[in-house]
């Protein structure tokens, strides 16, 4: 009898456990956000935690986590729950898929709602203790906008719209329109720091905003961005196709490199598109993106192709040019105003050569001070025609370890191989977009970096859209310049921790070269220190270089300004 009783007790416990799982569903991780008392920093931390949670077990490309593909994720780890609470205490819980950051369902007030194309995995494991309802539309933007009878550009975002959206979803009202609010303020903001920054500003100022053309084009092209980044490979900036964004005025902007894409969008996380080729420095050559944006090569290695062609922008915004357009062996390379002429068009091949007019960029010797010329690819020494182009903006001859350098900032300056001191005179960008990006630089407490004249420090002030002192020109030589006086550069006054950052005349120095890291830091490559609001105290009016900590006083976002 004891054996039978024990068996019955075991059966009861097992059934109870099974029933409990059936009622409760899987205990998925949860990342919550409460509007009541929320500040900009609260929202920042919420998105940071959400990114970390969905990125568990991922690898990185250019410092950005690549979300896992469906085949790599067990059901018990497939979703993250995101409870959102409004000012009245109503809570709606979103279910977010860790493979793509999509909102796949939500619950509130003992009800749950699934899109009409919901999978059995979603319905069997999410909100199973609620009354499950199926919506008449899917979760893509076209369907949501049709169901809402409005477009995203007409829907306000910010604390008040989020408050109203939570109320509506809690009661099952205006579902499509409300989802358009929460999806952009949660999923899209997790994908793009630009969108995060827009929401943070609205929280700080208690205002609302509508998405602009640039923001909407980001949302529509996350998949193609992810593909271009993964196909280029780790530690590589140039893309092999382009990402088509829109400017604020709805004109097209074709982005062809990671550095520019990051400065414009602040992309923070990648959709898995294909397995990147293993590489550190070498440029890889993939196929152009074809088909609609949401189709991807799940599980396939990125396909390679032979070449792509770009300008090379360097010191003072001048381009690498074959002198006088001559294709004679030994013709030197020089700086010259950027254009579309064939002697400024450089083809990057999969054999690590860089070619113009059918000839190879060639080191005329492998010693410090050797000049760089074009030469017949078949007869030049092989170690003189090989180049690496890492993401930091150097162009390196790997045999010598020397880098391409522009010793003067003037047209007709002959380019040389020199020791790599991470100078601005050694910074380059491979792109067809030869003009500098003009942007504000937003940092600690949503304040803007401000210039205060030559030989003076920079510091933080409240952002003002019309302030010329807060407008910066981001050059291809990796300098940050005062937009109204482009001969002045952001400069670290030394390379030691706590050295001040000031404004000096641009001289191509290592102290004037900066790298916008994908973790939000702005790095001086020479010192390896980052731009830092001293002691997290804006009233000190001191910006310094300091070892990287990842703290908020070292986090920066560029906000591109209308041209």
From Swiss-Prot:
Disulfide bonds join 274-302, 319-338, 360-377, 448-463, 489-506. Residues 1-25 form the signal peptide. The keyword tRNA processing does not apply. 2-alpha repeats lie at residues 445-482. Keywords: Disulfide bond, Glycoprotein, Hydrolase, Lectin, Plant defense, Protein synthesis inhibitor, Repeat, Signal, Toxin. Non-toxic type 2 RIP which strongly inhibits mammalian protein synthesis but does not affect plant nor bacterial protein synthesis. The A chain is responsible for inhibiting protein synthesis through the catalytic inactivation of 60S ribosomal subunits by removing adenine from position 4,324 of 28S rRNA. The keyword Phosphoprotein does not apply. 2-gamma repeats lie at residues 527-554. One of its GO terms (biological process) is defense response. Disulfide-linked dimer of A and B chains. In the N-terminal section; belongs to the ribosome-inactivating protein family. Type 2 RIP subfamily. 2-beta repeats lie at residues 486-524. 1-beta repeats lie at residues 357-397. It comes from Sambucus nigra. 1-gamma repeats lie at residues 400-432. Its EC number is 3.2.2.22. Pfam families: Ricin_B_lectin, RIP. It is an enzyme of class 3 (hydrolase). This is Nigrin b. One of its GO terms (molecular function) is toxin activity. Glycans are attached at residues 221, 368, 376, 483, 537. It catalyses: Endohydrolysis of the N-glycosidic bond at one specific adenosine on the 28S rRNA.
């Amino acid at each position: 009898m004891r054996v039978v009783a024990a068996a019955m007790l075991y059966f009861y416990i097992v059934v109870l456990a099974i029933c409990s799982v059936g009622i409760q569903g899987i205990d998925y991780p949860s990342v919550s956000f409460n509007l009541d008392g929320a500040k900009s920093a609260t929202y920042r931390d919420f998105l940071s935690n959400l990114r970390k949670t969905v990125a568990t077990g991922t690898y990185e490309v250019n410092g950005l986590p690549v979300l896992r593909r469906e085949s790599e994720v067990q059901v018990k780890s497939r979703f993250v729950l995101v409870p959102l609470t409004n000012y009245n205490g109503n809570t709606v819980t979103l279910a977010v898929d860790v493979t793509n950051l999509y909102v796949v369902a939500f619950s509130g007030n003992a009800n749950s709602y699934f899109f009409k194309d919901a999978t059995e995995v979603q319905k069997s494991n999410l909100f199973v203790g609620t009354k499950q309802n199926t919506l008449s539309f899917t979760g893509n933007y076209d369907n949501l906008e049709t169901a809402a009878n409005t477009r995203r550009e007409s829907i306000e975002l910010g604390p008040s719209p989020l408050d109203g959206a939570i109320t509506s979803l809690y009661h099952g009202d205006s579902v499509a329109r409300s989802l358009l609010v929460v999806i952009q303020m949660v999923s899209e903001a997790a994908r793009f720091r630009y969108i995060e920054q827009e929401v943070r500003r609205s929280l700080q100022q208690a205002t609302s905003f509508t998405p602009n053309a640039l923001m909407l084009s980001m949302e529509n092209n996350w998949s193609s961005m992810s593909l271009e980044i993964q196909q280029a490979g780790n530690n590589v900036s140039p893309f092999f196709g382009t990402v088509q964004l829109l400017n604020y005025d709805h004109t097209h902007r074709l982005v062809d490199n990671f550095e520019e894409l990051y400065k414009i969008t602040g992309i923070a996380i990648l959709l898995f598109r294909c397995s990147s080729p293993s590489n550190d420095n070498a440029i890889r050559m993939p196929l152009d993106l074809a088909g609609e944006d949401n189709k991807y090569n799940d599980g396939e290695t990125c396909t390679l192709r032979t070449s792509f062609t770009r300008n090379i922008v360097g010191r003072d915004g001048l381009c690498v040019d074959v002198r006088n357009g001559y294709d004679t062996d030994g013709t030197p390379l020089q700086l010259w105003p950027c254009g579309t002429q064939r002697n400024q068009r450089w083809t990057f091949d999969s054999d690590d050569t860089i070619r113009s007019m059918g000839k190879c960029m060639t080191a005329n010797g492998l010693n410090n001070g050797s000049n760089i010329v074009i030469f017949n690819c078949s007869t030049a020494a092989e170690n003189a025609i090989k180049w690496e182009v890492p993401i930091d903006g150097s162009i390196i001859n790997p045999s010598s370890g020397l880098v391409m350098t522009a010793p003067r900032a003037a047209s007709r300056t002959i380019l040389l191989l020199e020791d790599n001191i991470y100078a601005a005179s050694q910074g380059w960008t491979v792109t067809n977009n030869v003009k500098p990006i003009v942007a504000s630089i937003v940092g600690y407490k949503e304040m803007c970096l401000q210039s205060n004249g030559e030989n003076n420090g920079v510091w933080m002030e409240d952002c003002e859209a019309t302030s010329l002192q807060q407008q910066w020109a981001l050059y291809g030589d990796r300098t940050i310049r005062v937009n109204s006086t482009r001969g002045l550069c952001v400069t670290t006054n030394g390379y030691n921790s706590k050295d001040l950052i000031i404004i000096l005349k641009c001289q191509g120095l290592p102290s004037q070269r900066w790298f916008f890291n994908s973790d939000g830091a702005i790095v001086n490559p020479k010192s390896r220190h980052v731009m830092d609001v001293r002691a997290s105290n804006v009233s000190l009016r001191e910006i310094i270089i300091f070892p990287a900590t990842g703290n908020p006083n070292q986090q920066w976002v560029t906000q591109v300004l209308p041209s």
